[in-house]
Regions:
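Short, structured beta-strand/loop micro-motifs enriched in basic residues and often containing a Trp
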Residues: 1-9
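Feature captures the catalytic cores and cofactor-binding loops of soluble hydro-lyases/lyases
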Residues: 31-32, 36-159
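Active-site/ligand-binding-proximal alpha/beta "capping" segment
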Residues: 88, 164-182
Length: 182
């Protein structure tokens, strides 16, 4: 099923998505990679607030290349999501609506997705230049000292993703293999 979803994502939208759905996202998403996740965890451990609101928001695991003149961002392909698996359950418990990355997730992350009615999307690896064309604005909003791993606020329009793990725990990486083996 092809769906158009506004982000931040509404709970009813997240709950209605199924593994394998093709989705385009329009609105605001945030980027964060390993170093930013580590710093957010340190802030939480110290009893500090996070630099971005989690409720309903979407984090894209991505660190862009430098922007060409006249563009808001350079190549913007996904990074391997499993590197954030130690941090994702806590952020999901704080209300994170969805994550975008590539690759498999740990069982702890899948359990947190189900527990919180969230979703994990995949973006196409190797298509960063094409994906960047769907990013209309980019602004560093936290951890500027981390360079490419700083947290960015992105305005996206018709940003293409696929639901890999839905709010019921259905996992496209597992079901696709079973379907192929028939």
């Amino acid at each position: 099923m092809d769906r158009q979803i506004s982000v931040p994502i509404k709970k009813e939208d997240a709950l209605s998505l199924r593994a394998g759905d093709y989705v385009t996202l329009t609105g605001t998403i945030y980027t964060a990679r390993d170093a930013a996740h580590k710093r957010m965890q340190e802030a939480l451990d110290a009893g500090e607030s996070l630099p971005i609101e989690m409720q309903g928001n979407v984090i894209y695991y991505m660190g862009p290349s430098p922007a060409r003149e006249g563009r808001p961002i350079g190549s913007a392909g996904p990074t391997t999501a499993s590197r954030m698996d130690n941090y994702a359950p806590k952020l999901l418990d704080l209300g994170l609506g969805a994550m975008i990355g590539k690759g498999k997730r740990s069982q702890a992350v899948i359990d947190a997705i189900v527990r919180n009615g969230s979703v994990y999307f995949a973006a196409i690896g190797g298509a960063g230049a094409l994906l960047s064309q769907r990013i209309k604005k980019s602004e560093v909003v936290a951890y500027d000292d981390l360079g490419t791993e700083a947290i960015r606020k992105l305005e996206v329009e018709d940003f293409p993703v696929v639901v890999v793990i839905d709010s019921q725990g259905n996992n496209l990486y597992e079901t696709a293999i079973k379907e192929y083996q028939k």
